[in-house]
């Protein structure tokens, strides 16, 4: 089964999380969620993240990049200001890049790529 990881934090831009979350499920991905705060949070517009109340949240410290095929980094300026300060998340992004796995960014999610220093000599 294909596995995707969405990394985010409090005040993510709601639709930038919700749309890829449900589209990946529709495409039969197993979708895991890693949240900077390691707990359910709210999107900037008030949506519960993750939206399904029983959807598990992975502990950031325990995520193994080898378990995933795809990484999604949704935006939300307020969220990314905090998430990009989490050294573990930045290391995870660097490892996804090192293993040449697909990384999808939406809007200000690209800030995480900059913090992980994986944008040099690339078109974003």
Locate each region found by the language model.
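Extended, subdomain-level signal for the structured scaffold at the beginning of enzyme domains
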Residues: 1-99, 103, 111-121
